[in-house]
Amino acid sequence: MSFIHPLADPCLYPLAHQLIPILSSTFEEEIQFAIGVRQLCRKYNILFIADEVRMGAGKTGKFLCSDWLGPENKPDMVNMAKSITGGSYPASYILGNDDVMGPDMIKPYETGSTFCMAPAANIATLTALQIYDEENLLQRATDIGNKFAEITKSWKHSFIKYVTNRGADASIYIKPGNVVTPRRIARLAFQRGVFIYPHGERLRIGFALNITDQEFDKGMGILKSVLDDVESYGEIPGSIHEAETPEQ
């Protein structure tokens, strides 16, 4: 389904792209793909919008994912939400360069929304930005990512396809057709005190940027124990797999 605004300009063709989705096995592959998309948009005069709702606000080690593309590949617009306040209060923002949102393009009272002046959202955003700077959370995201990569490179579980991360956000891809599934791993981890999100063939792991080293080490230890033990389990409450379904 799609919606076309009755006042939409038929000559305006924007492209919104989540630059770093952690779907490839390497960070560099996603960066190069995003650069290629951005350059195609520039070549054909297509508005390029960077979707930073989930992966923006420092998670990858830079404040914006688009920062990884280099200054010559900046997007025309950026949309942010969710992570911009550290999850403390709902807020969303649209950023744009002068060619798209400058004073010659948008006049007073041409934009607005019901909650655009929500004081709580504004304060939550400003406070989160202050904490990012004071606690050097961009560097912390990089440190978390490096530590995660160092720990997981020695994991040799036969059902793991590959492990990859972008700063403090990570994915563990599971080979299809196994008794071991992302959902079974996630449910067993949940019982042991660690929440990870099963999504398709992968486990998505998002580390809080203010996590302590002790909390990180404890969580990674639990995750490793789950991966070591999961093949020996039959039924895992909350998980659904043919291996758990009793024969009729």
Q: Language-model features: where?
A:
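Conserved N-terminal phosphate-binding loop of PLP-dependent enzymes in the Aspartate aminotransferase
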Residues: M1-S2, P6-D9, P14-Q248
